[in-house]
Amino acid sequence: MNLRIILTVAALLAGTGAATANCYEGLGCDDSQYFTTQALQQGTCQQLWEVRNMIYQQNGYCFQTNRAKQSFSNDGCYINDQASVRLNVYERKNVATIQSVEKAKGCK
């Protein structure tokens, strides 16, 4: 799974201001397909963090941490409270599954 290349392309596209889903080889599209635990386990902690935060970015979240601000642009963001970000059913489940895998892997 070449998630790094796909993430790079998705990050470039996210900067265009278009609210579009990110699709990942081996995972699917984050707003219309459920990611499987098995597929997510193939990713590194960094990749999991990036995929999870791409979901929040495409839904208008303004990142608060220095790490996230350096990795994602806050241009065009409009929601400061992560709990207020409106995610659809697929996105909510995918975030939860990613967080579960991150926890199992001991990601920080």
Q: What positions do the PLM features span?
A:
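Compact alpha-helical subdomains of small soluble proteins
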Residues: 63-108
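Bacterial N-terminal signal peptides that target proteins for export
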Residues: 1-7
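Acidic/histidine-rich, surface-exposed loop or edge segments in extracytoplasmic proteins
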Residues: 27-37, 77-82
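Hydrophobic helical h-region of N-terminal Sec-dependent signal peptides
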Residues: 8-12
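N-terminal signal peptide c-region/cleavage motif recognized by signal peptidases
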Residues: 15-18
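Amphipathic alpha-helical packing elements
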Residues: 39-73, 77-78
